[in-house]
Amino acid sequence: LVAMGHEAWTLEETTTRVRKSLREAFPELFGDRWEEARDIFYGAYREVHLERVEKIDGAEDMIGLLQPQGSHLGVVSNKSGGHLRAESTKLGWDRFFAGYLIGATDAPNDKPATDPIYMALEGTGIDPGPDIWFIGDTWVDIACGRAAKCHTILVGDNDPESAEFSDHPPDEHYLSCRDLLEVVRRL
């Protein structure tokens, strides 16, 4: 932001404001200079992102329970596809997702559009619908899942009663992956 003449955001501001993919958010933020801003951002991001990647508590246990049951697992993210796949490899999670890691710019449109969901299900014979769990931690995730008619699950401390979820409330809400894991264990 600073390199592009904007004031820096605090971590809290960043967490609140960053929802859309870069290709959708940067033109709004930086206008005609968005590609320059993208190059600056990715230059800085590449230097540190794999060093800071950490597993979310309970996430690996949950996907480790679901996959052997025959559940199709995929990730739909507004993080760039290359970065998403590099993180999966670093975490040792490629075995769970069998190539179904869909990041920003992999599909024609990014979340909240449904294109990435269809891409994540391509070749599986599975159609989006209420039997498909779409789990996320932001309104963009829930809006995407609801638009595809999936069962939406909000995980984290975002308040599902807040204004950002008024047009697309989640079907379920859990404060942590560990809480959702307890539900998965009972399946």
Model-derived features with residue positions:
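Structured helix-beta-strand junction loops
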Residues: 69-70, 168
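Asp-based, Mg2+/Mn2+-dependent phosphohydrolase catalytic module
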Residues: 2, 12, 64, 80-81, ...
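Residue-level marker of alpha-helix boundaries and capping positions
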Residues: 13, 53, 75, 132-133
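N-terminal helical cap/lid subdomain that shapes the substrate entry/recognition surface
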Residues: 1-61, 67-69, 85
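Structural motif
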Residues: 17, 76-78, 135
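Short, flexible loop segments at the rims of nucleotide/cofactor-binding pockets, characterized by
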Residues: 49-53, 78, 152
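Residue-level detector of anion-binding/catalytic polar loops
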Residues: 7, 72, 151
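Short, surface-exposed loop/turn motifs that are enriched in glycine and acidic residues
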Residues: 49, 73, 106-110
